[in-house]
Amino acid sequence: MKSNSQDAASIVWHPQLVTKQARNQSNGHKSRMIWFTGLSGSGKSTIANAVQAELFKRGIQVYVLDGDNLRHGLNADLSFSMEDRKENIRRTAEVGKLFVDAGLVVLAALISPVEEERQRARSRFAEDEFLEVYVSCTLQECEKRDPKGLYKKARKGEIPQFTGIHQPYEEPKNPDICIDTTDRTVEQSVQIILPIILEKIAWKEGEQ
């Protein structure tokens, strides 16, 4: 019986006639992976969706990969164990890479608590294709917000292995963008992040 490595060695990558560069040129902007990381309740998904709306208004091809949404389908078979969290990030990075190759700006919003796994996700992209956005917020504020009631359930022991309560969150060592949402509104956060993303994707007002 062949090993997985032997099977993989016999698989050849099939190049496409339409390249990523051609898609970027057609779209009028560069494709990028924007990876939002932070505690539950910090505002990752809310900010990512607000940024998506602003980019979409400008005619930019954009899509949000939300961690919770992915667990309804692609990652529905995964638990919250450390090994499954790693696989969750791996799958999301691979899907995101396909979307970037297709010419999209991808906004991934996942807790992704382990620095090593975030760096592994980054390694799947070209050096200038991946931007890490650390959505910083104190645990106290996240727990106060608790929009999904998860912290309350975790404190009661109803949710094991919950990041910030039972498992640590490793802060990014050198994020491309750091935004503290403890005392900032979503709108204020978007105003800080959006210009940076527009510059990174080389989009210019009035060219669409």
Curated annotation (Swiss-Prot):
GO terms for molecular function: adenylylsulfate kinase activity; ATP binding. The keyword Membrane does not apply. Keywords: ATP-binding, Kinase, Nucleotide-binding, Phosphoprotein, Transferase. It is an enzyme of class 2 (transferase). The keyword Disulfide bond does not apply. ATP binds at residues 38-45. It comes from the Bacteria. GO terms for biological process: hydrogen sulfide biosynthetic process; sulfate assimilation. It holds the Pfam family APS_kinase. SUPFAM superfamilies: P-loop containing nucleoside triphosphate hydrolases (SSF52540). Its EC number is 2.7.1.25. Pathway: Sulfur metabolism; hydrogen sulfide biosynthesis; sulfite from sulfate: step 2/3. The active site is at residue 112. It catalyses: adenosine 5'-phosphosulfate + ATP = 3'-phosphoadenylyl sulfate + ADP + H(+). InterPro entries: APS_kinase, P-loop_NTPase. Belongs to the APS kinase family. PANTHER family: BIFUNCTIONAL 3'-PHOSPHOADENOSINE 5'-PHOSPHOSULFATE SYNTHASE, PAPS SYNTHETASE, ISOFORM D. Catalyzes the synthesis of activated sulfate. This is Probable adenylyl-sulfate kinase. It comes from Halalkalibacterium halodurans (strain ATCC BAA-125 / DSM 18197 / FERM 7344 / JCM 9153 / C-125). The lineage of its organism: Bacteria, Bacillati, Bacillota, Bacilli, Bacillales.
